[in-house]
Amino acid sequence: APVVAKLAKDKGILTVGVVTKPFRFEAKTRMNNAMSGIEKLRDSVDTLIVIPNDKILEIVDKRTSMPEALMKADEVLQQAVQGITDLINVPAVINLDFADVQTVMRDKGIAHIGIGEGKGDDKAVMAVKAAVESPLLETTIAGATDIIINVSGDISMFDASDAVDYVREITGD
């Protein structure tokens, strides 16, 4: 993957990697190989999103089977990739084009991506809060230099403004 990513990046193609780190209970060799691969990939892509499998243990029940937990890990990866592609491909009230996404993701290194849902009066803030505080990620948005917030659903301009204000408060912007 790092070789293909580097070739694409060298041609000016925006490259985004989304990877998982093995569970701690897996063989040490597997973790060492994964960490080595992540380091190589980090140098070969514009943006890298790393999701530690151990974080899945924080969102599943103790009775969750191993296959179900691994399916959850796959879902998280799928949501991350889908979220990025939807920014460009799915029409929205405020549309982003590929240039906007490139500006935020080109040569940025490790990134944070979160997905959240909310209901009720503060649904937009609840959704953004859930996204930025996702237990599945090791990163934080504190100090982030570039951010894309994609809020969908039946929300008002005030809801959207409140959600952005919440993010600005965290990032110090």
Each predicted region: which residue ranges?
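Tubulin/FtsZ superfamily GTPase core signature
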Residues: 1-173
